Amino acid sequence: MTFNRRNDRNVERETSEFEEKMLFVNRTSKTYQGGRRFRFAALVILGDRNGRVGMGIGKAKEVPVAIEKAKSIARKNMISVPVENGTIPHEIVGVNSTSRVLLKPAGPGTGVIAGTVPRSIAELAGITNMLSKELGSRNKVNVAYAVFDGFKNLRTAKQVRALRGIEAAPVTGGAQ
């Protein structure tokens, strides 16, 4: 029996648990004897708005194929972001190449105050209050990798205590 793609057209695609956001599509060209050949690169972010987010860059001769490749890569590169009360647990600087991104926690009601790339990633990770500043190069790909570097290095107070071997002190009701 041969496989025919035309038979699959009416089958519903499975719904993903992740929301997706395409940050940008880049077109490159190579000149050959007969003319130019174009290729496309797509940067896609996937997230469940509940602490899980992934990023992928797909390259292909056509835009839809590049986007599908990017989604597939993003699913494989998922990370967990510790979200406490809608914000990140502490201030951190993410670095990639010459791009640095400062990520700061913010109080309730602040919202996500950030550039396009950090805002998209934070919102798909489920962060509702955060401050961000892009330092150095503002290349979208490098900024995205820098944000992911920052998110990967975030630790909750509980994780830090476990790493240091410290037990949590009981909270007493005030100064004595």
UniProtKB/Swiss-Prot annotation:
Family according to the record: Belongs to the universal ribosomal protein uS5 family.
Coiled-coil residue windows: none
Keyword RNA-binding: yes
Assembly: Part of the 30S ribosomal subunit. Contacts proteins S4 and S8.
Protein's name in the database: Small ribosomal subunit protein uS5
GO molecular function, one term: rRNA binding
InterPro entries tied to this protein: Ribosomal_Su5_D2-typ_SF, Ribosomal_uS5, Ribosomal_uS5_bac-type, Ribosomal_uS5_C, Ribosomal_uS5_N, Ribosomal_uS5_N_CS, Ribsml_uS5_D2-typ_fold_subgr
rRNA-binding recorded as keyword: yes
Ranges where the S5 DRBM domain occurs: 18-81
Key words of the record: Ribonucleoprotein, Ribosomal protein, RNA-binding, rRNA-binding
SUPFAM superfamilies reported for this sequence: dsRNA-binding domain-like, Ribosomal protein S5 domain 2-like
Organism of origin: Deinococcus deserti (strain DSM 17065 / CIP 109153 / LMG 22923 / VCD115)
Domain of life from the UniProt record: Bacteria
GO cellular component: small ribosomal subunit
Free-text note on domains in this protein's UniProt record: The N-terminal domain interacts with the head of the 30S subunit; the C-terminal domain interacts with the body and contacts protein S4. The interaction surface between S4 and S5 is involved in control of translational fidelity.
Biological role: With S4 and S12 plays an important role in translational accuracy. Located at the back of the 30S subunit body where it stabilizes the conformation of the head with respect to the body.
GO biological process: translation
